[in-house]
Swiss-Prot record:
Keyword Manganese among UniProt keywords: yes
Keywords: Aminopeptidase, Hydrolase, Manganese, Metal-binding, Metalloprotease, Protease
Catalysed transformations (reactions): Release of any N-terminal amino acid, including proline, that is linked to proline, even from a dipeptide or tripeptide
Cofactor note: Binds 2 manganese ions per subunit.
Domain of life of the organism encoding this protein: Eukaryota
EC number of this enzyme: 3.4.11.9
Family classification: Belongs to the peptidase M24B family.
One Gene Ontology MF term: metalloaminopeptidase activity
Species whose genome carries this gene: Arthroderma benhamiae (strain ATCC MYA-4681 / CBS 112371) (Trichophyton mentagrophytes)
Cystine residue pairs: none
Enzyme class: hydrolase
Name this protein carries in UniProt: Probable Xaa-Pro aminopeptidase P
Cofactor(s) listed: Mn(2+)
Length: 698
């Protein structure tokens, strides 16, 4: 899966999670199954949004709002791999209301950081008809604009109707969504935001019109400060309001909160007991002299307590909050969702509290502050991704220290049990993909079958289900033929998808959730005769992939230093791609956090020709310490171990375009693919023949 992150991103198939077992989350009552059905029932894009915008503008007028903005950043394609987590789902649902002054915007991100991507997609699609995973929709009384990044330029152009202006993020001369919003809010207009959907920042006031913060949210945008500063340049200002206009639009039709069962991730797969993890967190609190940590990020809670849920499609998390002090651990969750095993798992070690009581509990915590015997400063630790409303409940900045969550860093470093689980599940998943590609080629070429993109995705799911420890997909399968492959986060729908063309490129980006790990693999194939340019583009992408796989770098290196390894060959030809080269914990390319041994990341360069084809080649890799002849500065050096086991397409491989070293890399890789996966097909002649052909030396 790919992700665009101009300032933070290699992982972000969100702060991205690499959960080791699958299963989800939210604060307001939303049923993911209902949301998913709604998404599937939506009419094919583009949708005429005239009436929807008119209704929204009526509500804006009633609430004395001139501008309404919704920011959403989540990754449709992001498998939650708690094991490598860095969950960066900005979910949308936002809201606002202002009064006394005319004004503006509701910026939204997500509740609980991890996982309401379906909800966001529905909300964003409802208003704009755009179904991409990242962007910002802004509506004034006379204009509507949608800002998104390069992954979605093509998709947005197709899905937005005439009511909307597309703001291409990162393109010279095009305003950012903050700048565009500031233009709409000039001359003293006030921009309102839901405090549960933004992080606390400077220059923000809380509206005295409401005294109770009702909405719960844990992963919020960190742009409140930036937005406030931008608004000041045009005379606008930013305040927090408690009302959510989207809730008002939904009314009684708002889906109920998920009530899916919560299960235990056994220590045999987690590699570490939750008691040890909680104790490690307490040591961190003691080192920082803090009284407690309030946790709202769903993947962090699931990882910390070795629990898994299924409240969010493809993501093993559940709606919850947690508070950890030097002596007590509290989990705020709907107790009816806990399996008997989960209850026993927590019994006597974790105090269970009602999910909806977190804000009151935070206020009580703030009032009591820290006990004198704790030796702490009395301040509470809060993730810098937590909501402004949660910070306020804890007493604001005088009681709260907002930092990068220590749990995020702990999750990013996999233990040996987790790493071995990743390796094993990739062997099985590689076999499933090999079986699928062999079946697909045979069906298209030998049998002349008419198969569409959804047929392909469904067949892959059927095949994966046969393999041990499979739980479900880790994200929506991107099964795309021809021009659809150029839409980076393409999602085929039965009513609008294309028939797979054997004479066109076929891009398949998919992943599975297994009890012992999560997979994410992309391969691009051709079942006919590719053009010379297609083979050259494929070679350039493969060269970049190999360059990353072979990279050796000193500990402390960030993704910025490595990104050019993947792009250098494309750059020499004047080509590039508009997404991050990878994702994983701690992030990789486009990440500010240095890479560390035992991070799990993706390596996925690509190339996309709009209206024609797309190429992406993705393996997951483990960052590990490597032996070098010297150690400059007595610093260890790191490299990568590729764990994905699926061959590259022989029809697209032109050996003459690769160096001798690159050809050796391909041959060695294919030999390993054959060794690890061929035993699965001893009684499957068709797949064995396909695999033997695709792994032959070049």
């Amino acid at each position: 899966m790919t992700i665009f992150r101009p300032h933070l991103r290699f992982l972000f198939k969100p702060h991205f999670l690499y959960f080791q077992s699958p299963i989800g989350k939210s604060s307001r009552p939303f049923s993911t199954s209902q949301i998913l059905r709604t998404a599937l029932d939506m009419p094919p894009p583009p949708v005429d949004t005239t009436q929807r915008l008119a209704k929204l503008r009526e509500l804006m007028a009633q609430n004395k709002v001139d501008v309404y903005s919704m920011q959403f950043r989540y990754t449709i394609k992001a498998p939650l791999i708690i094991t490598v987590v860095y969950s960066f789902f900005f979910f949308l649902l936002l809201a606002l209301k202002l009064c006394l002054r005319k004004t503006a915007i509701s910026q939204s991100t997500l509740l609980h950081v991890t996982g309401v991507e379906t909800l966001i997609r529905i909300t964003a699609a409802f208003i704009s008809s755009f179904t991409g995973s990242a962007g910002c929709a802004i509506v004034s009384m006379s204009k509507a604009a949608l800002s998104t990044d390069g992954r979605y330029f093509s998709q947005a152009a197709k899905q937005l109707d005439a009511n909307w202006t597309l703001l291409k993020r990162g393109v010279e001369g095009v305003p950012t969504w903050e700048e565009w919003t500031a233009e709409q809010a000039e001359n003293g207009k006030v921009v309102g935001v839901d405090p549960s959907l933004i992080t606390a920042g400077e220059n923000l006031q809380y509206s005295p019109l409401t005294s109770v913060i009702v909405v719960n949210c844990s992963y919020v945008i960190a742009d409140a400060r930036k937005l406030s500063q931008t608004l000041k340049t045009t005379g606008g200002s930013l305040i927090g309001i408690d009302q959510n206009l989207i809730d008002a639009v939904w009314g009684d039709e708002r889906p109920a909160r998920p009530a899916n069962q919560i299960t235990v991730q056994p220590v045999e797969r987690a590699g570490k007991s939750f008691e040890e993890k909680v104790e490690d967190l307490r040591k961190e609190l003691a080192a920082k002299k803090r009284s407690a940590m309030v946790i709202s990020t769903l993947d962090e809670i699931a990882w910390l307590f070795n629990l898994r849920g299924s409240d969010i499609p493809y993501n093993p998390v559940f709606f919850s909050y947690a508070i950890v002090t030097p002596s007590v651990a509290e989990l705020y969750v709907d107790e009816s969702k806990l399996s008997p095993e989960a209850r026993k798992h927590l019994e006597g070690k974790v105090i269970l509290k009602p999910y909806d009581s977190i804000f009151q509990a935070s206020k009580v915590l703030a009032e009591s502050k820290a006990s004198a015997s704790s030796g702490s400063s009395g301040k509470f630790l809060l993730s810098n991704k937590a909501s402004w409303s949660l910070s306020l409940a804890l007493g604001g900045e005088q009681n709260v220290v907002e930092v990068r969550s220590p749990i995020t860093d702990a999750k990013a470093i996999k233990n040996e049990v987790e790493l071995e689980g990743f390796r094993k599940c990739h062997i099985r998943d590689g076999a499933a993909l090999i079986e699928y590609f062999a079946w697909l080629e045979n069906a298209l070429i030998k049998e002349g079958a008419q198969l569409d993109e959804v047929d392909g995705a469904d067949k892959l799911f059927e095949i994966r289900k046969k393999y041990d420890l499979f739980v479900g997909n880790s994200f929506d399968t991107i099964s795309s033929t021809g021009a659809n492959g150029a839409t980076i986060h393409y999602k085929p729908e039965k009513s609008t998808c294309a028939v797979i063309d054997p004479e066109a490129m076929y891009l398949c980006d998919s992943g599975g959730q297994y009890l012992d790990g999560t997979t994410d693999t992309t391969r691009t194939l051709h079942f006919g005769e590719p053009t010379e340019f297609q083979k050259k583009a494929y070679a350039l992408v493969l060269k970049g992939h190999i360059s990353i796989d072979n990279a050796i770098f000193p500990k402390g290196t960030t993704g910025y230093a490595i990104d050019s390894f993947a792009r250098q060959h494309l750059w020499k030809e004047g080509l590039d791609y508009l997404h991050g080269t990878g994702h994983g914990v701690g992030s990789f390319l486009y990440a500010e956090v240095p890479l560390s041994a035992n991070n799990v990341l993706s390596n996925e360069p690509g190339y996309y020709e709009d209206g024609n084809f797309g190429i992406r080649l993705e393996n997951l890799v483990i960052c590990k310490e490597v032996q070098t002849a010297h150690k400059f500065g007595d610093k260890p050096f790191l490299g990568f171990e590729s764990i994905t086991l699926v061959p590259f397409c022989q029809k697209l491989l032109d050996a003459s375009l690769l160096t001798e070293a690159e050809r050796k890399w391909v041959n060695d890789y294919h030999a390993r693919v054959w060794e690890k996966t061929s035993p699965f097909f001893e009684k499957d002649e068709l797949t064995t023949a396909w695999l033997k052909r695709e792994t032959q030396p070049i």
